[in-house]
């Protein structure tokens, strides 16, 4: 006679998990903590939180959001004699401007070309000057500049003339925002001397408004001395913005 308490294959009781086994599975499935005690995604030692690396860093805007026109005028290879021999590098000449009457030039040296250009660009941004423009397209009056053996002549031009300039001088006027000008350079073809002479001539530019304030007169009075009628002088004086 079979024992009534014996269990057959079909009458096996359900197995129950021991508390130790349940805790072991939960512990094995839990994420590992960082070295500092925090989780992988947070906590003090986490990758994205606490003292971890910040990913929301923004680059500094050195120009205050202003868009500048950058012109690479000249680049040449230079060498420096040191105790162990010669050390070669590159020198760059860059002109920058906002196209609205401000421009500057800079010179930079480095072992690599991109670094030399970046140095020259940074120097040009720090040396920008304001040049008054007539109608926002040409110079108010003629001017001359001199540096080294170079002499440059700048002349204002009527609308539609364009930029009559070559080489380094064209880059200056394009970045400055001048649309009509006639220039001439004699004495040198060195781009450094030409650029410096050009900026010397631009630095001497004055507007009728500044001259009138310095003399204590009206702008129309200065224009009438050029032979213009009263009505034409007043209309031209009203059009002067700087």
UniProtKB/Swiss-Prot annotation:
For this protein, what is any one GO molecular function term? rRNA binding
Question: What are the record keywords, sorted?
Answer: Ribonucleoprotein, Ribosomal protein, RNA-binding, rRNA-binding
Can you name a GO cellular component term? small ribosomal subunit
Domain remarks in the Swiss-Prot or TrEMBL record? The N-terminal domain interacts with the head of the 30S subunit; the C-terminal domain interacts with the body and contacts protein S4. The interaction surface between S4 and S5 is involved in control of translational fidelity.
What function does the entry list? With S4 and S12 plays an important role in translational accuracy. Located at the back of the 30S subunit body where it stabilizes the conformation of the head with respect to the body.
Summarize the subunit comment.
Answer: Part of the 30S ribosomal subunit. Contacts proteins S4 and S8.
Please give the name of this protein: Small ribosomal subunit protein uS5
Q: What organism, scientifically named, is this protein from?
A: Sphingopyxis alaskensis (strain DSM 13593 / LMG 18877 / RB2256) (Sphingomonas alaskensis)
